[in-house]
Structures are given as C-alpha cells and as structure tokens.
C-alpha cells in the first residue's frame, strides 16, 4: 500500500511524485515497488538514482528532491521488503543488484545514470556500477 497523501505532505513530497510500479523480475515474478520520482524538465533529462540503506526508505531523499536543479530526473525507490514496496522476504546481495536492473528497465531508464547512495545502498550501487561500467 502506498503512502497516504497526508504522509507525503508531512515530509514535503508532492503526492504526484509517489507511485507504485509493477516490475517484472529476473526471477519470473512481478513485484510492486514504491518509487518517488521527480520528473526532469525534458525527456532526455539526466537521471539521479537514490538508493537508501537500512532501516531507511525513499523518504530519506525528500530534501534532495527539492535541492537538485529541476532539469534532473530523480528516482528514489523503496527496496523490496522495505518502506512501501512489496515484502518479498530475504534477498541476497546479488539478487538486490539484479532488482535494481529490473526496476530501471521497468522505468525505461537507460545509462548513463548518476547514483547517490547511503549505508548498504552504497554496496548495491557499487554492484550495479561493476555490472554497468558505462
């Protein structure tokens, strides 16, 4: 279940930035991800992917959404089993890196992207960067 309008307004996030995305997974399942997205001003806007750690979630990045220039598209997902994303149970490091690939594919995001990460989101960002050096 996604956050309520009131929860979003309490942290200064416009409700239209919050969505639930159905993501086909590399494991054959489809998972519901909660994602905060601020669109860029153009279709070709640079993309900043914000990966939280534990025990936080996408709301950690709400201030950054207001600080970065409006011509940047910002995406901050709740990892699976965290925040408002679907609870899938334990997931390995390798699986979580593939989960990020699945999400970006579902959002039609191509490289290059910038990644901002916190806590073990940094380890996931490194895993993604190793698999996608461009």
Where does each model-flagged region fall?
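Short, hydrophobic alpha-helix immediately C-terminal to the catalytic nucleophile
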Residues: 62, 101, 126-130
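Glycine-rich, phosphate-binding/catalytic loops in enzymes
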Residues: 65-68, 91-93, 133
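Short, conserved clusters of charged catalytic residues that mark active-site
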Residues: 56-60, 95, 123
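Soluble, non-transmembrane catalytic domains of enzymes that act on hydrophobic metabolites at membranes
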Residues: 33-36, 67, 123, 131
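Conserved hydrolase catalytic core segment
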Residues: 111-134
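Conserved HGGG/HGGXW glycine-rich cap/lid loop of the alpha/beta-hydrolase fold
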Residues: 37-84
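Alpha/beta-hydrolase fold catalytic core
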Residues: 1-48, 69-72, 98, 109-110
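Active-site loop/oxyanion-hole signature of alpha/beta-hydrolase fold enzymes
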Residues: 21, 26-29, 36, 76-116
């Amino acid at each position: 279940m996604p956050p309520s309008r009131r929860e979003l307004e309490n942290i200064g996030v416009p409700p239209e930035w919050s969505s639930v995305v159905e993501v086909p997974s590399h494991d054959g399942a489809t998972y519901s991800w909660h994602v905060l997205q601020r669109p860029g001003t153009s279709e070709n806007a640079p993309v900043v992917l914000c990966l939280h750690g534990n025990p936080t979630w996408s709301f950690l990045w709400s201030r950054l959404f207001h600080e970065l220039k409006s011509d940047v598209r910002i995406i901050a997902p709740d990892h699976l089993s965290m925040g408002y994303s679907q609870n899938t149970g334990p997931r390995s490091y390798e699986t979580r890196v593939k989960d990020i690939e699945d999400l970006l594919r579902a959002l039609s995001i191509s490289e290059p992207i910038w990644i901002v990460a916190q806590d073990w989101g940094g380890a996931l960002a490194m895993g993604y960067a190793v698999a996608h050096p461009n």
